[in-house]
C-alpha cells in the first residue's frame, strides 16, 4: 500500500474554548491554503459510500480501531475540483489516497457505473471499483461542514488544526 500514515487526534471543545484557541492560533499559525480570504474558512461537502448493511457506519459508531471510508468531496460548493478519496484508519494513524474526478465521472458513479475507474492509474480508483463491484458500495450520505484549518510546517510535513465552525 503506497503512501504514508499520519497521526490524527480529534477532540471535542466547547464554543468558548474554540474562540480562545482561534485567537491564539491565528496569531501563531497560517491559515490553510484553501481558506477563503473573506471568512478564513472553507466549506466541505462529502458524499460517503457504504454497503446495504451500512458496514462502514457501523464500524465507525462501534469505535473500531481499523476501518476505512470511501467518499467524494467538493469544496466551497463548487465542482471545479472533485476528489475521490479512500481514508484508512488504523488506531490513531490515517492513510488517505485521493484522485480527481470530472463532473461526468462523478455522475457515472452516482448511477453505479464505475468501470471508468479501471482506466485511472492513481489510488484509490482501483479500491473504489473493487468495493463497488464486490461489496455493493453505493452513495448513501452527504455530510456538510465548514472547516477553519491552521497550518504549521514541522520538518517535511504539516500539522493541521481544524476548527469546525458548524
Residues of each region from the PLM?
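N-terminal strand-loop-strand beta-hairpin
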Residues: 1-153
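Conserved small/polar residues in nucleotide/adenosyl-binding loops
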Residues: 159-165
Amino acid at each position: 500500500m503506497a503512501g504514508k500514515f499520519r497521526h490524527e487526534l480529534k477532540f471535542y471543545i466547547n464554543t468558548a474554548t474554540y474562540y480562545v484557541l482561534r485567537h491564539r492560533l491565528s496569531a501563531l499559525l497560517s491559515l490553510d491554503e484553501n481558506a477563503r480570504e473573506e471568512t478564513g474558512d472553507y466549506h466541505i461537502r462529502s458524499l460517503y459510500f457504504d454497503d446495504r448493511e451500512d458496514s462502514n457506519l457501523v464500524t465507525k459508531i462501534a469505535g473500531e480501531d481499523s476501518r476505512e471510508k470511501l467518499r467524494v468531496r467538493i469544496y466551497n460548493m463548487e465542482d471545479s475540483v472533485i476528489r475521490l478519496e479512500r481514508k484508512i484508519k488504523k488506531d490513531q494513524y490515517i492513510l488517505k489516497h485521493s484522485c480527481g474526478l470530472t463532473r461526468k465521472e462523478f455522475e457515472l458513479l452516482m448511477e453505479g457505473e464505475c468501470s471508468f475507474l479501471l482506466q485511472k492509474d492513481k489510488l484509490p480508483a482501483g479500491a473504489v471499483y473493487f468495493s463497488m463491484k464486490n461489496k455493493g458500495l453505493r452513495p448513501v450520505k452527504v455530510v456538510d461542514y465548514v472547516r477553519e484549518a491552521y497550518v504549521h510546517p514541522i520538518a517535511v510535513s504539516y500539522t493541521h488544526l481544524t476548527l469546525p465552525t458548524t
